[in-house]
């Protein structure tokens, strides 16, 4: 069954698509916090993201990376369903799901689109969870125009930098 549904929004046609129609849906790996350093150094140059919200999920730095330019979301705990774009190379712990797309869809704009709806799919029975199979089936409205997504992403990134400067 095709979940595409075209609508007219702004100047472009946007489509309703399932996350797994756009992204490879995967997960990070276990990493002991003791193997990370709080600051970059010669050996540990890649950011490590976890499920925490402190420092935008930054746990520390590590010598290896698993992903590059991808979207993460918190799978378990109080912050389950929190979605972020991670630019550059990074390591993601096992309490994060990861969305991978090599064609430009992994960006700030799409992470915000998903973040606006992901909370609705968090299972709140016991420990809150948003598992890979559930994330994969979430429907989002998205433009197929990568240039439009890049422009929206630039605005979001500039806005985020402005907020960071004034905190």
Residue ranges of predicted features:
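Conserved aromatic/hydrophobic "specificity hotspots" at molecular recognition or selectivity sites
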Residues: 1-31, 43-46, 52, 152-167
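Proline-centric
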Residues: 10-13, 97-104, 120-121, 128-150, ...
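Conserved sequence/structural motifs within the catalytic ATP-binding
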Residues: 34
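Conserved, non-catalytic sequence blocks in retroelement Pol enzymes and Pol-derived host proteins
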Residues: 37-38
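A generic fold-level signal
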Residues: 41-43, 65-66
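A short beta-sheet element
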Residues: 50-115, 123-127, 131-135
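Short amphipathic alpha-helical signal-transduction/dimerization elements
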Residues: 115-118, 160
């Amino acid at each position: 069954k095709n979940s595409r549904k075209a609508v007219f929004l702004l100047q472009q046609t946007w489509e309703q698509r399932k996350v797994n129609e756009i992204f490879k849906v995967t997960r990070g790996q276990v990493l002991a916090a003791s193997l990370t350093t709080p600051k970059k150094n010669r050996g540990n140059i890649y950011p490590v993201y976890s499920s925490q919200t402190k420092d935008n999920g930054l746990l520390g730095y590590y010598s290896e990376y698993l992903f590059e330019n991808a979207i993460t979301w918190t799978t378990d705990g109080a912050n389950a369903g929190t979605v972020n774009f991670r630019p550059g190379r990074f390591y993601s712990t096992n309490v994060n799901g990861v969305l991978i797309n090599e064609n430009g869809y992994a960006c700030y704009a799409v992470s915000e689109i998903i973040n606006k709806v992901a909370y609705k799919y968090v299972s709140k029975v016991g420990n809150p969870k948003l598992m890979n199979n559930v994330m994969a089936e979430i429907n989002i409205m998205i433009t197929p125009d990568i240039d439009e997504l890049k422009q929206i992403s630039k605005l979001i990134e500039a806005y985020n930098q402005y907020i960071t400067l004034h905190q």
